[in-house]
């Protein structure tokens, strides 16, 4: 048995012993990896190593559980255990590693109790690959996936509660547009006035607000908007046809998962009990449905860690709401906030320029990126009179670089909208500069400057 003073020393030594495993992280990264209990907002600036932190955090949860974040010593701890840990911290001995791990473990997490959600298949694939490299085969049991992949797993198990079968089909955007186009034709609507892609945008926004077809129709009829009533009727028919085909579109996958969790207590309780730890990446890009999904899954233990950067929120046009990350602390009282501000990607001059621009944003959480890298080349700013002048300047700079000995492929042009590419194409053609494109072409020729 330990007295109170010894218990405090034991907890301190345990935290220090665990931290030795994560000496490759910087201090703030290490704090994030070792924070296990309760809600955590990780404000991760660009190039700050957030994926590395997520991987080490999951590894810590599985290896040591709550050991790095626990203020209680185990009842079985003896003075000899305290002496061992304090000695190990001062002089780590690989031969004593097994005993150190035994003394530091507190309720370690099993892999299937952890769900880590990110936005893209590429990011999810990288997360899985790096987890497997660090943790071995046990990493395969972690729910590391996109929002849609995680929801499909949940729906395959219980979607019969909503009137579908587990063998449901998933419609992609092209499938959805085809169904909408057929409905527009059947309803004798002008496809130019009621473009299928535009209608899908209305339907997507309605679903994000959790409005089913009949609810949306009633709302539009009450508002008395003739055009919206027509769109709502298309939505209701679209919903009916998908149900008849036992099919879901991309929005349905998350919407129906949220409906399932909200409307069936046993399903909700099963997943809230199952997932002790919920981690959400790119939280600044979440929409209302994704927010509801994350908060519902975390409703059991409230061990939710969200990673994001309010300075990188650019998907409002897709339904993303920055309020999800800005209001995290008010939703979860006592939430910890850790800022990852050390940048491993850029030079000092680039960071100083970006900090100077972004600090003018209103309502931001606030952080100041810094780096140990050299200053690098200065950032030059050119204010063009119009798009033509801008494109001419860019083309001239590239030509000057080529004349100075740089290769064409050493130059990259980033632009905000695809519509800007036409002027750049024309200016590049005038200087005979070869270009390669990345993304869909905005012109009929398909030639574009590379983003």
What are these regions (language model features)?
Residues 174-242:
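Coupling/switch/interface segments within P-loop NTPase motor domains and analogous charged loops
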Residues 61-70, 109, 136:
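Post-Walker A helix-loop "phosphate-sensing" segment adjacent to the P-loop in P-loop NTPases
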Residues 111-201, 382, 395, 437:
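Conserved P-loop NTPase-based nucleic-acid remodeling module centered on helicase motor cores
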Residues 38, 109-113, 138-141, 179, ...:
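Short glycine-/polar-rich loops that comprise or flank the Walker A/P-loop
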Residues 429-431, 436, 443-451:
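Conserved short internal alpha-helix adjacent to the catalytic or cofactor-binding core
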Residues 13-18, 22-54, 73-88, 99, ...:
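Conserved helicase NTPase motor core
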Residues 51-54, 89-105, 333-336, 341-434:
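Helicase P-loop NTPase motor core
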Residues 153-160, 314-330, 354:
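Short regulatory helix/loop adjacent to the ATP-binding pocket of P-loop NTPases
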């Amino acid at each position: 048995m330990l007295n109170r003073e010894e218990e405090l020393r034991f907890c301190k030594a345990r935290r220090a012993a665990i931290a030795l495993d994560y000496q490759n992280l910087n201090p703030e990264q290490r704090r994030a990896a070792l924070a296990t209990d309760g809600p955590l907002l990780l404000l991760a600036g660009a190039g700050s190593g957030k994926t590395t932190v997520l991987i080490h955090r999951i590894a810590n949860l599985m290896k040591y559980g709550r050991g790095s974040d626990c203020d209680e010593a185990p009842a079985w701890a003896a003075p000899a255990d305290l002496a061992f840990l304090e000695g190990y911290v001062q002089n780590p001995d690989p031969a004593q590693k097994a005993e150190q791990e035994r003394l530091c473990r507190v309720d370690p997490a099993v892999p299937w109790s952890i769900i880590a959600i990110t936005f893209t298949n590429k990011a999810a694939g990288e997360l899985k690959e790096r987890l497997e490299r660090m943790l071995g085969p046990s990493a395969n049991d972690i729910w590391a996936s996109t929002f849609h992949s995680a929801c499909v797993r949940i729906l395959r198990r219980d979607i019969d509660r909503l009137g579908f079968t587990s063998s449901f089909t998933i419609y992609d955007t092209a499938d959805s547009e085809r169904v909408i186009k057929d409905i527009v034709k059947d309803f004798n609507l002008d496809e130019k006035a009621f473009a299928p892609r535009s209608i899908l945008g209305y339907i997507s926004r309605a679903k994000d607000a959790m409005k089913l077809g009949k609810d949306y129709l009633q709302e539009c009829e009450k508002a008395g908007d003739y055009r919206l009533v027509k769109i709502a009727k298309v939505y209701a028919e679209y919903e009916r046809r998908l149900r008849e085909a036992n099919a879901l579109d991309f929005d349905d996958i998350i919407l129906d998962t949220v409906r399932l969790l909200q409307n069936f207590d046993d399903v909700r309780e099963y997943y809230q009990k199952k997932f002790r730890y919920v981690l959400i990446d790119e939280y600044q890009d979440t929409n209302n449905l994704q927010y509801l999904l994350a908060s519902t899954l975390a409703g059991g233990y409230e061990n939710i860690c969200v990673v994001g950067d309010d300075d990188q929120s650019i998907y409002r046009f897709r339904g993303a709401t920055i309020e999800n990350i800005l209001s995290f602390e008010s939703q979860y009282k006592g939430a910890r906030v850790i800022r990852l501000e050390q940048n491993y990607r850029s030079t000092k001059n680039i960071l100083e320029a970006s900090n100077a621009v972004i600090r003018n944003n209103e309502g931001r959480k606030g952080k100041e990126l810094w780096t140990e890298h050299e200053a690098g080349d200065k950032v030059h700013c050119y204010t063009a009179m119009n798009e033509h002048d801008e494109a001419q300047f860019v083309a001239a700079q590239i030509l000057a670089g080529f004349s100075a000995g740089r290769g064409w492929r050493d130059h990259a042009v980033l632009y905000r909208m695809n519509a800007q590419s036409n002027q750049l194409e024309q200016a590049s053609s005038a200087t005979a500069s070869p270009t390669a494109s990345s993304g869909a072409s905005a012109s009929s020729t398909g030639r574009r400057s590379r983003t």
